[in-house]
Structure formats: structure tokens, C-alpha cells
Amino acid sequence: MVEGKIVQCIGAVIDVEFPRESMPKIYDALILEGSELTLEVQQQLGDGVVRTICLGASDGLRRGVVVKNTGNPISVPVGKPTLGRIMDVLGRPIDEAGPIESENKRSIHQKAPAFDELSPSTELLETGIKVIDLICPFAKGGKVGLFGGAGVGKTVNMMELINNIAKEHGGYSVFAGVGERTREGNDFYHEMKDSNVLDKVALVYGQMNEPPGNRLRVALTGLTMAEHFRDEGLDVLFFVDNIYRFTLAGTEVSALLGRMPSAVGYQPTLAEEMGKLQERITSTKKGSITSVQAVYVPADDLTDPSPATTFGHLDATVVLSRDIASLGIYPAVDPLDSTSRQIDPNVIGEEHYSITRRVQQTLQRYKELRDIIAILGMDELSPEDKLSVARARKIQRFLSQPFHVAEVFTGSPGKYVPLKETIRGFKMIVDGECDHLPEQAFYMVGTIDEAFEKAKKIQ
């Protein structure tokens, strides 16, 4: 191993000098002598000096400390020994359950699969959440984004998806906690443990309190583990919470490295960094990666460069709205803003397609009439419009659903609604078969039959 020494420390940025003839390559991992600390090479400054980002706390570092070059990028353990374990960005266990006995290691920097290896799929993935299955259905092997501002329910929605898909799915899952709260990571671990699926999940955490280098690379660590399972011919679920923190860590690192910021202070390489990550999250002829990514939307502004860059990579976007959350309708998915590439009669079938479009038309009409209702009241509307409004309000309430993961808070048991039941329920509402029922009967129920039962109790 070639040795160098630290010549400058500025926060998480460490400059290391090596002999000129053996200068480390970009992304090489360097190790500090006598410590567990790893540095990753980001720039070559010339004359044997490289600029690195510290993957860990840089407290106590000083000039002259000896650094060794491993000659390879950061490699993490992959395969079955990682299942049921919690790891950090370097693949080291942080669950105090002993070392990870994995013979296979894989570099976190990999090329995206070649064009001829890709295998797009149109097979639907049922989630059991009415609004998602109806409005923005997921494809097996597709990429899904949960967009929302602070506190509208991204993490709860993701937990419910994990609960409904990962438990039914039976395959392996990888969860990458990128710059989120440690408490959520802890809750998730115990949730998995209690439902006996922990032995099928690998957990990788780089939480809010960690240096930017860790938060930037932890998504790649999780992805590398998911890629390994995919290349072994398995269908993997890959959950990321939160992609925005990945971008934010990139912004911090970019500023530390002295690059000029671009729009809104983001790094100039935003699109490239996002592309490098997203292009690897894909399905090949060997196996599939179905990914669900939470995306924080700063100040509820979907045109912010970070969420805007993410949009282009996704097959389905689930947009969570503060207005809908304020009505008490959860999940607070906006049925007019959320989209999916699967909404095509050739993929989901003519019936599902027409019901989805009719539901959206009814809700859109209600949205247009809201101003008139606010100014003139309901009495000024035509009979057709009154009917549209009544149905739209029923649809709005029927799009709500009690979640399994929120049982502790709400006290009402969670509901899993099969796709056929979802389509049947909304078909009955738009066909006018539920016009005689009060709208509160549709709030927080599972199937349409439960709404009829609830209506009897109300009346």
C-alpha cells in the first residue's frame, strides 16, 4: 500500500500528499493509519496532492498523519449475510450483532447496465392502497417517487408500501436511510422485526447527524447491495428515504470542494449525480429492482431543481398535497397531480383506464366549481354540477384509507384493498349507484361494502 500524509484539513475536506508517481485515482478509498476512518478521493490537485472527503467525523485529524491508499473504491459486503443487519455507508455493522461474514464484496461505484441488458416490464404491482392502485399504479421493476413537503406523510406512505408489498412479496428488500431521522430508522427496524420479515431485509443508514460524505454515498451502498441480488436473478425491492437528502449532501460536498454553485445554490453536477444513481436502479434480463423513493419537496415547490431533476427518472409519481392533508384525508395523495406510465388501456385494461379517467374528470370539475361555490354557494349550480360535486366529495373521501402502520395512532385497523375491489368501488360511485349514501360513510373505509355498512349505522 502506498503511503501519503495529510497536508490540510478543512472540515470534512482533507488534502493528502502522495509521491507524484503513485497518485491515487478518483474514488479510491484511503485509510488513516491506526484508525477506522476512510477518505474518498474526489479531486486530483496535482503534484501528488489529492482532495478527499472524509466518511466519518474528522475531529482530531492534523497535518502529517499517515494515510494509506487501498488502490480500490469503497467496497461493501453483499449477498445473504447482509440480510437482517443494519450497516453504515462502508458496510460495517452498527447493530452490535457481530461482524458480517460475507465473502463477496462489491465496489459502490458501478456502471449502469448496458442498453441491450435492460428489460422493461408492464406487469402491475398491487399495493393495496386504493388511490395508488387506481390513479398511479406501479409496475413491477419500475421506479416510483413519493413527492411531498414536510409533514404530509411521505415516510408513513413508504412504511405502508413496505408493509403491503415487502411482506406479500416474499423476496428480498434493501432499505437505504439517506439523511433521515435516526428515530425513523429505529422504528422501521422494530416494525420489520415484529412482523418477522427482518431476515429478508438489508438496512443501510447514513442519518441526519452524519457528515455529508456519508449521506452522499449511503444511497450507493444500498443500491450496490440491491444490484447484487438482482444480478443473481432475484426480484428486489429497493426503498430510499430520502432522495432529496442525497442531493443536499451533494450540494454540501460540492461547496466544500470549492465548486461554483448553480441555480438555487445546488451543485453544478446535480443532473449528472442524480443520473448516475438513477440509471443503476433498473431491471435487467437477469432480475428486477422495484424502487420506491421518498422525495422531500422544499417549501412545497415542485419546480425546485432537486425534485424537478428526479421527476424525469421515474415511472410513477405519487404527489402528496398539503391541501388534501389539511382536509384530514390520508393518504394525502393528489389524484390530479399524480401520474403513472402504466395508465394506458393496453397495460391496465379498458375498464380500469376508463374508471381512472372518469374519477379524475369528476374531481377536476369539482376543482373548477370550487370558486363559484365559495362565492355564490351550492344553490347557484345546475343539477348536473350539483351531482358532480356530490360524487366528487364521495370520491375524495373514498380515496382515504386506514393504514396498518398508523393503527397505533388512529386506533382503527389498517385495510388492504385488492385492485378489483378498488375498481368496483369507484365504478359504483361514478355510475351513481351510491348517490343515496351520505358522504361521511366513505371516509376512512376499505372496500365499498364497508361504506354501505357505515351508511346504515349513520342513518
Curated annotation (Swiss-Prot):
GO terms for cellular component: plasma membrane; proton-transporting ATP synthase complex. It is found in: Cell inner membrane. It is a peripheral membrane protein. SMART domains: AAA. PANTHER family: ATP SYNTHASE, ATP SYNTHASE SUBUNIT BETA, MITOCHONDRIAL. F-type ATPases have 2 components, CF(1) - the catalytic core - and CF(0) - the membrane proton channel. CF(1) has five subunits: alpha(3), beta(3), gamma(1), delta(1), epsilon(1). CF(0) has three main subunits: a(1), b(2) and c(9-12). The alpha and beta chains form an alternating ring which encloses part of the gamma chain. CF(1) is attached to CF(0) by a central stalk formed by the gamma and epsilon chains, while a peripheral stalk is formed by the delta and b chains. Produces ATP from ADP in the presence of a proton gradient across the membrane. The catalytic sites are hosted primarily by the beta subunits. This is ATP synthase subunit beta. The gene is atpD.
